[in-house]
Amino acid sequence: MLQSLQNTGIQARLTLNTYDKYNASVSKLDSSWKESLNKIDETLFSNLSIGISEHFIPTPYNQKNFKNMIFDYRSCFINNLSIGDPAIPYKTIASGGTIPCAMAMVYEYFILVNKKDKIFQTREELLLHISTTLVLNGYRTQYAGTSWISLDKILELVYGIPTKIQASIFNMCHSVASCNPVIALVPTSWLHGNPLLLSNEAILVWAIKNGEAIISTTTSDTLERVKVSTLFKNIKRSWACQIQ
């Protein structure tokens, strides 16, 4: 697994330098996304009815429901016993698990729609496996954004779900119309209406109907609806997910 990551140009142990190289490789996609925002047509979105039926969307993975799961750059495990008082407190899924929860949601969706046998018997077991894989392959809480690279590579290399960074709002609409769930990173401040929240949060875009996007977040048990043009303007980067 580590060798596979290295062969893609991503070092097993990610650093800020690795992150800079990754950003440079996708900067053109980010630029084209921003340019496409100038072509937003509200009337177009109001007439769209595309995407995955709510009937097929799994219950969202709410990271708040996994407070007993440790997940940071050192390890990932179920915390049934006291771990003492480390110099740097351990983080839990509840406070830092937005990306693994989004990845788990995508994985469960494809298992359901393709009617495949479950490899993981519980949601907690799946989330623990994803989180452990992230930690072992370079996720580092000290380095902002390294989890973006991990998401990009691990969904495909480990779970067989290729991802493609969306280069424009039209790319994304096409992906949604093709019933490919899209993971998007948005400002936590916008998502929760609190300007004091400075991080990013992963959401999943499932459908676009009547000018609204149907999304799931990793901090709620239910689906939500947001104005699609506002959503597009707040997306930092997005990945369409599909099964080959």
Language-model features: locations:
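Active-site-adjacent structural segments surrounding the nucleophilic cysteine of cysteine proteases
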Residues: S4-Q142
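Conserved active-site-adjacent core of cysteine acyl-enzyme catalytic domains
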Residues: Q11, T18-D20, E108-L112, D117-Q244
